[in-house]
Amino acid sequence: MYAVIVSGGKQHRVKEGERLKLEKIEVETGGVVEFDKVLLVANGDDVKVGAPVVEGAKVTAEVVAHGRHKKVNIIKFRRRKHHMKRMGHRQWFTEVKITGITG
């Protein structure tokens, strides 16, 4: 059984017991998160596609950890002017473990 959920403006295909990194969610470690924006639920040959979401479908997950991704380096420069600006960015994430899919 798998489902497609929306979290942080992105769509994720999830299965029960799977761990994945999502955009930062304001829930403490060990807490439970419920995703009600479920776009698709599939159980073998029984596939339910929402328009836009599947009514009554829900995915529950447990928050495992919070952290930051690897650093992304950004370089801006102006040609022929000897001007360069170096910047970096590290995006926050929340790692969750999918505990249940209903619907």
From Swiss-Prot:
GO biological process terms on file: translation
Cellular component per GO, a single term: ribonucleoprotein complex
Single GO MF descriptor: rRNA binding
Keyword Ribosomal protein: yes
Keywords: Ribonucleoprotein, Ribosomal protein, RNA-binding, rRNA-binding
PROSITE patterns (alphabetical): RIBOSOMAL_L21 (PS01169)
InterPro entries xref list: bL21-like, bL21-like_sf, Ribosomal_bL21, Ribosomal_bL21_CS
Pfam family, one: Ribosomal_L21p
Keyword Nucleotide-binding: no
Sequence similarity: Belongs to the bacterial ribosomal protein bL21 family.
Function, as annotated: This protein binds to 23S rRNA in the presence of protein L20.
Record's subunit section: Part of the 50S ribosomal subunit. Contacts protein L20.
The protein's name: Large ribosomal subunit protein bL21
Organism: Hahella chejuensis (strain KCTC 2396)
